[in-house]
Amino acid sequence: MTDKKSVLTQILKELNAKNSVEGSAAITRDGLMIASVLPEDVDGQILAAMAATMTGAAETAVSEIKRGLAEKVIVESKQGKLLTTGAGPNAILVALTRADVNLGLVLLGMKKAAEKIEREVK
């Protein structure tokens, strides 16, 4: 594992451990995996591609309706949540949670992790 990848993996492990996150990933804006700590039943490559597509679509939609910059995307289902947030101009942070998680705490943890990821991915 490269040094940068190991640093990113550690950031993701901390996010998962401290914030009731079941899985997380740092991905490129074009949908490639940089680093991940995901459950075994989640295909990281598919998650990366879909999360990048969703984030890009949300950013375009918000821009088109003149509402500034999209900060995060939240998808909720009965089984859990999928959240994405930008981690600078080059990366996106993705998190998977249970449905009953404290969303505020997860988003705060994601903000801190995204700032760390942005510094590493420059």
Model-derived features: where do they sit?
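Non-catalytic interaction/Regulatory regions outside core domains
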Residues: M1-K122
